């Protein structure tokens, strides 16, 4: 009854999303990685852009990392893009990605090889597919389960934030879902609840229920097809769930960059190295070991600034010195999950660019060809209006 009620609700109320209109493992994989840290509405544009440029695993694997990062620009959590690229290079010839909408139903459910429709073909069984998916960089249990379910209709649960919320309320579970114990517990619940006859449809339905009805705040319990079985609703604890582990304190970090500009409108950029934030993204010349939090900027006056992107979690304040012969300064604040960045971009007009190691001379008109962090993109947006 629970399965049927949920699936019937889904069939009447689900949104039309491009990754639901395909069973191509590659496209479903791309969508799942994008949606790991991005809302559906925000991720839609990026998905279309990414798939348009990299329509299959071969086009992605043969691209440079710089180009992949460029097409990921704005999504954040850039390790996702780097892992996508690595995985594409590792898996480009894997049998799994040779399956498409025309032969997707030929996946073997037993450990023995099967014969494709009209063809002799060594096919993969469900365990081989799940194992292959989990071996890919950036793919864990949830993402592997989601791809196996949505692309191959295999009986694996798909757990995202929406599903954790539905399960925590359905079972009135007070275990923090983002702990090691919680992940194991909720995976067990999801496996027990899964409709093994219709895993693709069931996983889509429970995720959609969390997105449209079982909301983080003001959930629409009266419209929920699972309200008869919901223990949190019966115990009046819906608003208290799900439980998260305490989040680490966000620390302040101060950054300063110099934007050199010649009369020919050229500048210097360099690519970030190491394992810090924005690995392999480009940026202007960073002034190291600078802490300007106590600087006196009373001599700076506000300048007209571009509107922040809709939905941005950044605040921004553009400033410029009174005397036009002096450098300009752009002050920006950008919030990451674990850091609050206070950045200042000092614009210096120079007759020629300084000789700085590991930098690249580029035209300001060509900055669109390089991948930058969202913070640096705001500074570039200001430059475009000068």
Task: Specify the residue positions occupied by each region the protein language model found.
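Intrinsically disordered, low-complexity, charged terminal extensions of DNA damage-control enzymes
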Residues: 1-15, 21, 211-386
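Catalytic cores of DNA base-excision repair glycosylases
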Residues: 4-5, 9-220, 226-235, 239-240, ...
């Amino acid at each position: 009854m629970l399965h049927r009620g949920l699936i019937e609700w889904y069939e009447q109320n689900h949104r039309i999303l491009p990754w639901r209109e395909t069973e191509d493992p590659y496209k479903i994989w791309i969508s799942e990685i994008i949606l790991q840290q991005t809302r559906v509405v925000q991720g839609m544009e990026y998905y279309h852009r990414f798939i348009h440029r990299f329509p299959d695993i071969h086009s992605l694997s043969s691209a440079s990392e710089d180009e992949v990062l460029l097409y990921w620009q704005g999504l954040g959590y850039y390790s996702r893009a780097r892992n996508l690229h690595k995985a594409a290079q590792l898996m480009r010839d894997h049998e799994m990605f040779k399956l498409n909408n025309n032969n997707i139903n030929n996946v073997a459910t037993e450990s023995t090889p099967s014969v494709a429709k009209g063809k002799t073909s060594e096919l993969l069984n469900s365990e081989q597919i799940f194992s292959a998916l989990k071996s890919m960089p950036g793919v864990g249990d949830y993402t592997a389960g989601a791809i196996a379910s949505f692309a191959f209709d295999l009986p694996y649960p798909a757990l995202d934030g929406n599903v954790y919320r539905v399960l925590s309320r359905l079972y009135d579970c007070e275990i923090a879902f983002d702990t090691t114990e919680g992940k194991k517990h909720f995976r067990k619940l999801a496996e027990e609840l899964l409709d093994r006859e219709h895993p693709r449809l069931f996983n889509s339905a429970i995720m959609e229920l969390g997105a449209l009805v079982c909301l983080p705040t003001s959930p629409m319990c009266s419209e929920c097809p699972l309200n008869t079985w919901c223990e949190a609703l019966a115990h009046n604890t819906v608003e208290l769930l799900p439980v998260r582990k305490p989040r680490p304190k966000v620390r302040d970090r101060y950054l300063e960059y110099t934007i050199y500009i010649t009369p020919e409108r050229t500048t210097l950029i360099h690519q970030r190295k190491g394992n810090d934030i924005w690995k392999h993204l480009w940026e202007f010349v960073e002034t190291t070991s600078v802490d300007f939090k106590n600087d006196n900027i009373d001599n700076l006056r506000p300048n007209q600034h571009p509107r922040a992107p809709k939905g941005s979690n950044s605040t921004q304040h553009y400033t410029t010195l009174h005397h036009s012969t002096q450098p300009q300064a752009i002050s920006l604040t950008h919030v990451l999950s674990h850091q609050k960045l206070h950045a200042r971009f000092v614009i210096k007009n120079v007759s020629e660019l300084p000789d700085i190691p590991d930098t690249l001379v580029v035209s300001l008109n060509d900055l669109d060809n390089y991948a930058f962090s969202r913070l640096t993109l705001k500074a570039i947006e200001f430059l475009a209006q000068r």
